[in-house]
């Protein structure tokens, strides 16, 4: 029987990175949120992932989050810290904007949809924290 080990300092597969898993959960949360908004008639298909979205982030923000997460885990050393910091800041902006865009507590939302509306920024905040952690690790060259 042989045991295969990775050399010290070797990176683990990208899909096992906590940041990647959290971003995948965020994408799923945005997808489900948009579908819930359309099925509940609180958003149209065109609004569900746009600037009028009540239960999902707009598509441009989702795209930026995906791109920055990929760069944060693909790049090495200090170069990876830049997209990780930007992702953390994007998540912060996303969470804060959720409180001021007029959608929070919208009268058209049921209690369950309002609960989902608070779940989305929570998932976004987790991604932001993990991105900040990734930035810190990357800036130290780990």
Residue ranges and their predicted role:
Residues 21-63, 90:
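Hydrophobic transmembrane helix segments
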Residues 10-18, 45-52, 71-82, 104-111:
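Juxtamembrane loop-transmembrane helix junctions in multi-pass integral membrane proteins
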Residues 40-56, 94-118:
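Interfacial non-cytosolic loop connecting adjacent transmembrane helices
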Residues 23, 105-139:
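Alpha-helical membrane-associated segments of multi-pass integral membrane proteins
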Residues 66-93, 99:
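Loop-to-transmembrane helix junctions at the membrane interface
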């Amino acid at each position: 029987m042989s045991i295969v080990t990775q050399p010290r300092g070797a990176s683990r597969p990208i899909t096992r990175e906590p940041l990647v898993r959290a971003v995948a959960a965020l994408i799923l949360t945005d997808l489900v949120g948009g579908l819930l908004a359309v099925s509940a008639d609180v958003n149209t298909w065109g609004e569900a992932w746009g600037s009028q979205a009540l239960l999902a982030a707009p598509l441009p923000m989702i795209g930026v989050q995906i791109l920055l997460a990929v760069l944060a885990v693909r790049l090495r050393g200090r170069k990876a810290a830049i997209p990780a910091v930007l992702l953390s800041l994007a998540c912060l902006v996303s969470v804060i904007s959720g409180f001021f865009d007029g959608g929070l507590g919208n009268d058209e939302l049921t209690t369950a949809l309002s609960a989902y509306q608070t779940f989305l920024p929570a998932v976004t905040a987790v991604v932001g924290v993990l991105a900040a952690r990734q930035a810190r690790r990357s800036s130290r060259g780990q």
